[in-house]
Amino acid sequence: MAHGILCGKGSPPSPIDSPEEINPGQDVTFIRAITPELCIEAVTKLCRQILPRKLSIDPNQDVQVLAPLHRGIAGIGNLNDQIRDSLNPHGASHSMGSTLFREGDKVIQTRNNYDKDVFNGDMGIIDSVDSINGKIEILFEGKRIIYERMEIADLQPAYAISVHKSQGSEYPIVIFPLLKQHFMMLQRNLVYTGLTRAKKKVIFVGDPAAYSMAIRNDKTLVRQTDLVRKLTKTET
């Protein structure tokens, strides 16, 4: 399927109309949810109920939502808020500007911190929140890191992240919202990158027409190819 996407061929799997219909043995699934509101509802239901029940997985450890845009109802910001409220509604919390962090939240480091030995793209789980002193303690793989008040700005919620941020990483299960409202980002390489981040299963949630729009649009690939051609011409 990934090769077909690069070639601009292929259509999404036959869409299903409810997360309840998902087949645990199917590698690629498309759930029809053509409005942002329906998309958010389906994504949160997958994370909270369907996937843990049908696949016996931990949504924090095994599921990663990848989205094309930060803003909007089905954007990364609102996805993080809705998934957090669904999976982790009661943890002690601390706000940093407009960003809320709760005990039990999945978070991502957004820049390299050599002193703490954590790097851009590292993911962890908030183990404790000290809202009085403005400190957060995070469990990364094999290590526990304390963030002081000013260091918390280097963290972002990570229930949902951008497709761009996911490059170089892999996850057991990827959920990929894909809507016409994402039209500015609907490109072939976006779908290819999202699909190939999944080790076991990818679940598209959204409008099949948006998938088709993305597959037909290879503008980024064309620009990259043209750049290579120009650079090669300059060197000769």
Give short role names for the model-derived ranges.
Residues 1-107, 113-116:
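Conserved helicase motor core of P-loop NTPases
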